[in-house]
Amino acid sequence: MKIAIDGMGGDNAPSAVVEGIVSALKEYSEMTFYITGPEDKISLELSKYDYPKDKIVIIDAKEVISTNEHPVMALRRKKDSSIVKALNLVKDGTCDGIISAGSTGAFLAGCTLIVGRIKGVERPALGPIMPGRRGNFMIVDAGANVDSKPEYLVQFSKMGSIYYKNVFNVDIPSVGLLNIGAEEEKGNDLTKATYKLLKEENTINFVGNIEPRYIPTGDTNIIVSDGFAGNTALKMYEGSAKNILGMIKDEVLKADFKSKIGVLLLKPFLKRIMKKFDYKEYGGAPFLGVNGICIKAHGSSDGKAFKNAIRQTKIFYENNVLDEIKKEFEKKN
């Protein structure tokens, strides 16, 4: 498998990118990586490590697209940017997939415009995997499409179900529609119309509306939503988890000696919980519906996060998720 990696994407690039790749090669020696970015900077970082030289290829790219640039305009203007060159490696078939921790807008727009949509897919969607109390769940769409149509949400449900089934080995993943109430008549025009379509769709295991407070249980495998509500729910969930863990730490610091002894006994359990909520463990979010394996890593990804994004890309590839999505949408054409 060959993976293109945006060497200048993210707050900690290129050092974290190189660290993640070198670490991944120790485990996945069969893989080859194409890093895009200024050759001198990438080479300098690589010189710090001992690695198989035939497994890493540097593709020189002089420009970088920043997060404050207009995504589409930047893609058109900066043809020599690290993200554009990485996307073109997937488009021309040199690489099987791409990972970037750079500008989300530029990445999603580039995946759609350069790599291209799968035939039959109206709108690609971002589908991060999140930890739940009783299992992982996917939110789709988590921000790629602020405005959506009911038909788009049905497609999001299908792509999310295919991903979840093949990656987590769940034969019939459950799909819930993010809404303000469980009743069918609740919500706005979009959710009401989507509910009717999902209920009639026999290829989806639709379990009805799901309120945000029930998402963290993990009982529902896929939470489908427009990108605005999905992104809001995702960020609220991430922020709540971070603040709850922060409150626990604050209380521990203020605790008396006996309480601190109790906390020490609970330390292994607390570490496991904290690990579940660490974005580094999940690597990135798959962008479903484009004609390539596209993984969006967190902007502040470190070496560990990049390694796990590579692992996630490998799982996507080995479980034939892309081919399965193509097969589903070929039926409709």
From Swiss-Prot:
Main localisation? cytoplasm
UniProt cross-references to NCBIfam families, sorted A to Z: plsX
Give the GO molecular function terms: phosphate:acyl-[acyl carrier protein] acyltransferase activity
Whichever gene encodes this chain, its name is: plsX
Would you name any one GO CC term?
Answer: cytoplasm
One GO process term, biological-process aspect: fatty acid biosynthetic process
User: Which domain of life does this protein belong to?
Assistant: Bacteria
EC number(s) per UniProt? 2.3.1.274
What family does the entry list? Belongs to the PlsX family.
Q: List where in the cell it is found.
A: Cytoplasm
InterPro entries hit by this protein = FA_synthesis (IPR003664), Phospholipid_synth_PlsX-like (IPR012281)
Q: What class of enzyme is it?
A: transferase
**Protein name, please?**
Phosphate acyltransferase
Q: What does this protein do?
A: Catalyzes the reversible formation of acyl-phosphate (acyl-PO(4)) from acyl-[acyl-carrier-protein] (acyl-ACP). This enzyme utilizes acyl-ACP as fatty acyl donor, but not acyl-CoA.
Coiled coil spans? none
Q: What is the lineage of its organism?
A: Bacteria, Bacillati, Bacillota, Clostridia, Eubacteriales
The UniProt keyword set, sorted, is: Cytoplasm, Lipid biosynthesis, Lipid metabolism, Phospholipid biosynthesis, Phospholipid metabolism, Transferase
Q: Tell me what reaction this enzyme catalyses.
A: a fatty acyl-[ACP] + phosphate = an acyl phosphate + holo-[ACP]
Q: Quaternary form? A: Homodimer. Probably interacts with PlsY.
Query: Pathway, per Swiss-Prot/TrEMBL?
Result: Lipid metabolism; phospholipid metabolism
| The species this protein was found in | Clostridium botulinum (strain Eklund 17B / Type B)
